[in-house]
Each structure stands twice: as C-alpha cells, then as structure tokens.
Amino acid sequence: MSRACELTGKTVQYGNNVSHANNKTRRRFLPNLCNVTLISEVLQQSYRLRVSASALRSVEHRGGLDGFLVKADDKELSQRARLLKRQIVKKKAEKAA
C-alpha cells in the first residue's frame, strides 16, 4: 500500500531536521492518511478509500464524495478514484436525461 492520498495525490515529502547548531539530517514528512468509508449518493454504494485528513475535510466541504470527485482534477486522483468519477458522471447524465 503506497503512502499516497487517493483523492488529492498527496505523497511523502522529504526535508531536513535542522538542529540549533544548524546540523541537517534527512527526514520524511508523511501525509496524515486515514482509511475511511465514503458513501456515493448517486451510485447508492459505499467505497473504502485511503485519504489524507485534509482531503476528508475537502470532501465534507464540497458536500460529499460525489461533489468532490466531479470537481476534482483527474491528474490528482488515483486510478480507482478516476473510475469512480466516471461512473458518477455517467449516472448523473442518465438521471438528467
């Protein structure tokens, strides 16, 4: 399992610990990932995703998983999330027609 958010694409970042004497040692900044179950209202189904805490706040801000995925850029999404987005857009188009 990779250390990457499935919705925002946040991954591990690298930097330095810097001491008072200005000694630098390499370190990793890990994303705050949570395993969550999100429900798609359009598809009437729940999905288990590994997302960052900030992405979870963004999902709630945009009114749920469907609203977030429709507005999200495909480059940031994981392959699973892109597939889910296509299904949601297709189902919304069917309901509108």
Curated annotation (Swiss-Prot):
The keyword Ribonucleoprotein applies. One of its GO terms (biological process) is translation. InterPro entries: Ribosomal_bL28, Ribosomal_bL28/bL31-like_sf, Ribosomal_bL28_bact-type, Ribosomal_bL28_sf. GO terms for molecular function: structural constituent of ribosome. Coiled coil: none annotated. It comes from the Bacteria. One of its GO terms (cellular component) is cytosolic large ribosomal subunit. Keywords: Ribonucleoprotein, Ribosomal protein. Signal peptide: none annotated. Belongs to the bacterial ribosomal protein bL28 family. This is Large ribosomal subunit protein bL28. The gene is rpmB.
